[in-house]
């Protein structure tokens, strides 16, 4: 594994995305559209500073952060909630905790070879996504 997550990453698989969205109380119609989409992630990393874009034909989401610095995040276009977000390194993986009205919410992201792995968690639901470097 490596801490270098720079690059453009195209989605290969998206396991249990609907279960994850249900745990976030995302409506039925939005879930049905979202599970059919393929996402592209663009990550610009300078040490512990990240600029990320998650793009699809339905919605885009930008997130800029510095590892180890808690910040207020509004999950616009996702579940539209305000959360306190902290992202840290655990080994070569980024681990995010999002504190708010949903319990056990966050994600873990790491790179192995030419693959980016992302596990999204909310409550007892885990979505596993795999992206390939473009």
Curated annotation (Swiss-Prot):
Q: Name one GO biological process term.
A: fatty acid transport
**Which PROSITE patterns does the entry link to?**
FABP (PS00214)
The entry's cellular-component GO terms read: cytosol; nucleus
Pfam families annotated for this entry?
Answer: Lipocalin (PF00061)
Location of the protein in the cell: Cytoplasm
Record-level Gene Ontology MF annotations: fatty acid binding; retinal binding; retinol binding
| Binding, all-trans-retinol | 41, 109
Keywords (alphabetical) are: Cytoplasm, Retinol-binding, Transport, Vitamin A
* Highest taxon of source: Eukaryota
Q: In which broad location class does this protein mainly occur, judging by the first location in its UniProt entry? A: cytoplasm
Functional summary from the UniProt entry: Intracellular transport of retinol.
In the UniProt entry, what is the domain comment? Forms a beta-barrel structure that accommodates hydrophobic ligands in its interior.
The protein's matches in PANTHER family, at most eight in alphabetical order, are given as:
FATTY ACID BINDING PROTEIN
Q: What does the sequence similarity comment in the record state about its family?
A: Belongs to the calycin superfamily. Fatty-acid binding protein (FABP) family.
Q: What is this protein called?
A: Retinol-binding protein 2
Question: Which lineage ranks, top first, belong to the organism behind this chain?
Answer: Eukaryota, Metazoa, Chordata, Craniata, Vertebrata
Tell me the gene name.
RBP2
